[in-house]
């Protein structure tokens, strides 16, 4: 069994073909393209090299795992607002889409099953976070559980400019 793994970030995109045992069979990376068409063309070139049993994607933003839509905002604005499940349906593969910081939290749970409560902070092109509560990943009602990226640091804001500059990101 070989899984296609993709990590979309604000600076770079990474791809790896991984065995069920976690062995990396192939890997590639590129600077994050300027648009969705370029990203999809590169992804297609990666996926066309072998037979895969599924696609696992790590992405910034608020991931609705039922619809495959990435909400919120990130350093890669063109990945938001449409269903990735629909976009990648032509491959005929199961797709697992998850927030990048949540992937860190899930990895910590896998490595440390005794973990009860933890906070994970991801610092890259943007800032993200995940929370482990009672031994489980906390996703939150609106898929933003643990997200620290746009946290108000000062209140009250009298203008939109003050509100934006009081947010914790960039």
Segments predicted by a language model, with ranges:
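Short hydrophobic alpha-helix segments
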Residues: 27-30, 74, 141
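Hydrophobic "anchor" residues
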Residues: 24, 70, 137-138
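Conserved phosphate-binding loops in N-terminal lobes of ATP-dependent enzymes
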Residues: 3-59, 66
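Glycine/GP-enriched mid-protein hinge/lid loop-to-helix segment characteristic of carbohydrate kinases
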Residues: 16-19, 36, 96-98, 111-170
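Glycine-rich phosphate-binding loop and adjoining helix at the ATP-binding site
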Residues: 33-44, 54-55, 63-117, 153-162
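Conserved protein kinase catalytic core
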Residues: 13, 64, 106, 128, ...
């Amino acid at each position: 069994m070989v899984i296609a793994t993709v990590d979309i970030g604000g600076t770079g995109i990474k791809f790896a073909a991984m065995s069920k045992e976690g062995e990396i069979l192939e890997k590639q990376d590129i600077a994050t393209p300027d648009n969705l068409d370029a990203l999809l063309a590169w992804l297609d070139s990666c996926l066309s090299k072998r037979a895969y049993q599924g696609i696992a994607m790590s992405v910034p933003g608020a991931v609705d795992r039922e619809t495959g839509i990435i909400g919120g905002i990130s350093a890669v604005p063109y990945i938001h607002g449409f269903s990735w499940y629909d976009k990648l349906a032509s491959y005929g593969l199961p797709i697992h889409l998850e927030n990048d910081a949540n992937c860190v939290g899930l990895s910590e749970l896998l490595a440390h099953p005794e973990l009860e409560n933890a906070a994970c902070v991801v610092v890259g092109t943007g800032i993200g976070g995940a929370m482990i509560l009672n031994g489980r990943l906390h996703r939150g009602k609106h898929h933003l559980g643990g997200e620290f990226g746009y946290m108000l640091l000062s209140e009250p804001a009298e203008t939109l400019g003050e509100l934006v500059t009081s947010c914790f990101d960039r």
